[in-house]
Structure formats: C-alpha cells, structure tokens
C-alpha cells in the first residue's frame, strides 16, 4: 500500500491548538478530507519516584472529563526545549518535586489519528520535595504518593486514569526489565 499524497492543507481554527483540514489523494485517485489537531509542541511526561520507591502522581481536574483524573506530572515542551529539561520543569511546577537523576525511557504519538504531538516519557529517580506548586491558572492538581501496587489497584478498579500514565508506566516497566 502506498502512502497517500497531500493535495491541500488549510488551518480552519487557531487557538491553544489549531485544527487543520487536509485533502488527501489515495493511489487510486480517490480524494478525501482528513481533519486533525495541530499542537505545535511536543510534551514530556514524568514517572517520578522518591528514594523509597513511591510514585509522585497528580490527581488533576480535567474539564473535558468533568472530574479528577489520576496521571503523571507533565506538559508541553517549550519551543526547542530539551525533553529532560522540560520534564524536570513540569515535575517541579506541578508537584514541587525535583530530580537530577532523570532519563528518557521512551516516546510515542499518543493519538496519531488525530494529533501531531509526540510525547517523551521520562523516569525521574530519587525525586525530592524542593518547593511548592507553581500551577497555570487552568491547572487544578493534588499531589499523591502511591506505591506501585496502589497504582495497579486503582487502574484495575476502573478509576478515572489518564491513559498517558498507563503508557508511561509501561515504558518504565520496559526500562527496568
């Protein structure tokens, strides 16, 4: 199967993210429209652990879900920002925790059918509380410390979980095999 060719592309909405409408042509000449979100910046998500192995996680109010959702600290990288530096920044801003022992454990496109964003997954070992939160006005985050067993139980119980956290924990499990 051949990759379709792009015939035209138009931004139909500009905002925190853009919406782009592309016209694509299949190898058989058939045209179709494809709409996607353009986020412009990649993101970093941090699996942070304290020296005693507890996971530093966020219980964050997410307006689209209409509820509190359990996830990992993280967010959009600044233009040209190194993923490790961005991960450290996001971890500190959202939780007040800091780690100098941080590394990339994977990356992926979380929703390539709709988004152009790539997420870098990082593991921050020996995270220590160095300050308070410095949240954006639209962020509502409670910090929780959990064991790996508690995280697994919450996921298995069907709690409201950010799927990106599940991917982050999976990448962490691969990095420690």
Model-predicted regions and their roles:
Residues 5, 98-105:
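A short coil-to-beta-strand element that immediately follows conserved catalytic motifs
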Residues 56, 71, 90-92, 103-104, ...:
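Conserved beta-strand segments that form the floor/walls of ligand-binding pockets within enzyme
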Residues 21-28, 111-130, 144:
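Active-site-adjacent beta-strand/loop module that shapes the phosphate/pyrophosphate-binding cleft
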Residues 2-3, 37-40, 44-89, 135-137:
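Conserved Nudix-box catalytic region and its N-terminal flanking loop in Nudix hydrolases
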Residues 81-85, 94-100:
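Beta-rich strand-turn-strand
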Residues 9-10, 107-111:
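Short, solvent-exposed loop/turn elements at beta->coil junctions and helix N-caps
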Residues 8-45, 51:
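Acidic, metal-coordinating catalytic segment for phosphate/diphosphate chemistry
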Residues 67-68, 79, 136-177:
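Nudix hydrolase/Nudix homology domain
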């Amino acid at each position: 199967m051949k990759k379709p060719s792009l015939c035209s592309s138009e931004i139909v909405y500009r905002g925190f993210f853009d919406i782009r409408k592309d016209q694509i042509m299949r190898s058989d000449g058939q045209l179709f429209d494809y709409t996607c979100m353009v986020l412009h910046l990649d993101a970093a998500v941090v699996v942070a652990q304290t020296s005693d192995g507890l996971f530093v996680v966020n219980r964050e109010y997410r307006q689209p879900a209409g509820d509190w959702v359990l996830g990992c600290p993280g967010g959009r990288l600044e233009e040209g920002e190194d993923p490790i530096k961005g991960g450290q920044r996001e971890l500190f801003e959202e939780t007040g925790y800091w780690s100098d022992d941080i590394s990339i454990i994977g990356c992926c496109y979380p929703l390539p059918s709709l988004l152009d964003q790539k997420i870098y997954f990082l593991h921050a070992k020996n995270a220590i509380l160095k300050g308070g939160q410095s949240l954006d006005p639209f962020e509502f985050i409670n910090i929780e410390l959990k064991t790996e067993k508690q995280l697994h139980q919450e996921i298995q119980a069907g709690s409201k979980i950010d799927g990106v956290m599940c991917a982050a924990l999976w990448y962490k499990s691969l990095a420690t095999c």
